[in-house]
From Swiss-Prot:
Protein name: Protein Rev
Organism, as annotated: Human immunodeficiency virus type 2 subtype A (isolate CAM2) (HIV-2)
GO-annotated cellular components: host cell cytoplasm; host cell nucleolus
UniProt KW keywords: AIDS, Host cytoplasm, Host nucleus, mRNA transport, RNA-binding, Transport
Record's subunit section: Homomultimer; when bound to the RRE. Multimeric assembly is essential for activity.
Residue positions of motif Nuclear localization signal and RNA-binding (RRE): 35-49
Entry comment, domain topic: The RNA-binding motif binds to the RRE, a stem-and-loop structure present in incompletely spliced viral pre-mRNAs. This region also contains the NLS which mediates nuclear localization. These overlapping functions prevent Rev bound to RRE from undesirable return to the nucleus. When Rev binds the RRE, the NLS becomes masked while the NES remains accessible.
Single annotated GO MF: RNA binding
Amino acid sequence: MTERADEEGLQRKLRLIRLLHQTNPYPQGPGTASQRRNRRRRWRQRWRQILALADRIYTFPDPPADPPLDRTIQHLQELTIQDLPDPPTHPPESQRLAEA
């Protein structure tokens, strides 16, 4: 089952990367040479950002199989409450002097 989950996770990552690539088509259209050059420059800049983002998506590790909540619950179950000592029957000397 983990192989299937790994494969589904990889397919999901690849679909996301493909979607990112499809959202940035190569610039087409009329205009002066400087307008076309600027459109291509902006496109290359977006393309580099998409490649960096795709690399981060692809290399980002999957969450651990053991959810942190389960580990936290196990840790909490191991905790015990210690018996507290009985409170003193007489107030300390400093409090008695302050009251007088």
